[in-house]
Amino acid sequence: MEFTDYQAKYFAWELTKRSPSDSLEKLAGAVANAQVDLNPHQVDAALFAFRSPLSRGALLADEVGLGKTIEAGLVLSQRWAERKRRILIITPANLRKQWYQELNEKFFLPCTILETKPYNAAIRAGQFKPFEVDDTIVICSYQFARNKAADVANTPWDLVVIDEAHRLRNVYKPTNVIANTLKQALKDRHKLLLTATPLQNSLLELFGLVSFIDERTFGDLSSFKEQFANLNQARVFGILQERLRPICHRTLRRQVTAYIPFTRRHALLEEFTPEESEDRLYDLVSEYLRRDNLQALPAGQRSLMTLVLRKLLASSTFAIAGALTSIAERLKKKLRKQALVESLEEEL
């Protein structure tokens, strides 16, 4: 028996009404056919995301390897079952295909990766709102969402999932253009933020992530600094915990060892003596990287690329070989271009 969209939405609403937002029954129907082995902490995290209907979102901050993508998939499946299908996933560009495969293969949720080429094709075809697609989840990169912020802001999203959300932790700084642009574009939308590292260097990063979801939680930046400047006081720390409890959920690896058999790894120390040729390669590359005039590396990226090259050099000769080949090709290309310019100048 097939249901119309209206009937399906009505039945989903009835099921939701009968089940409390923090009950397992709320998710049971939505993930009945999912190809995943669920762990208790994943179900708990998904239910947490539903717990407060007045909340503007949630921050799921489980440690690395505990399945935050699965937790998000549970939330997406329930929203899909409720016919709330205007869903956007913002993720680093290199993770777009991974999200596409996970949602397709494990939760049978249709997805579309939206990038420049299909976006422009949609515009040429007369679809002037490429983000507003029916019955498919839209996946895009941070940069693309930032570039198309006006489209993102004008789309009535039911849910926005933001992966690797620690990229937004400095949103309180005006210099973080991407984070501030996305915050403004998504200010009235329900958001689900995923990150394993909600706090790295400063408590202000936690303020940034929470304010991205709901600015009312901590107030403005100056109020936050004044209230939580001294976490050594038990009372202040307790207040911070209470403020975070309704919006942030975190599970640690040590809390799930009862049902997840993590691989036990042992570090072994081995002595390594480089050969004479390897020593010479190291010295030559180091000398090259110390040059004042280094044409192969862009001036604005020199420090970062030097660090990367030194890591490759410390790894193995095979690791650095590919990078050195690329640098050589880049220099040859510059020389050919320069020769062409000089040839044209002579003719003129």
Locate each region found by the language model.
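Hydrophobic residues on the short alpha-helix immediately C-terminal to a glycine-rich phosphate/catalytic loop
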Residues: A49, E63, V75-R79, W99, ...
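SF2 helicase/translocase NTPase motor core
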Residues: M1-L47, T69-I70, W80-I178, S223-R235
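Walker A/P-loop
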Residues: S55-L74
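Pre-Walker A (Motif I) flank of P-loop NTPase domains
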Residues: L54-A58, R85, T136, H190
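PAPS/PAP-binding and catalytic site of the sulfotransferase fold
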Residues: G73, L103-K106, S202-I213, Y282-D283
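Inter-lobe coupling linker of SF2 helicases/translocases
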Residues: F128, D134, V138-W157, K173-D188, ...
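Conserved phosphate-coupling serine/threonine residues in phosphotransfer and NTP-handling enzymes
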Residues: P92, T195, E275
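Conserved Walker B
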Residues: E63-V64, E164-L168, A196-P198
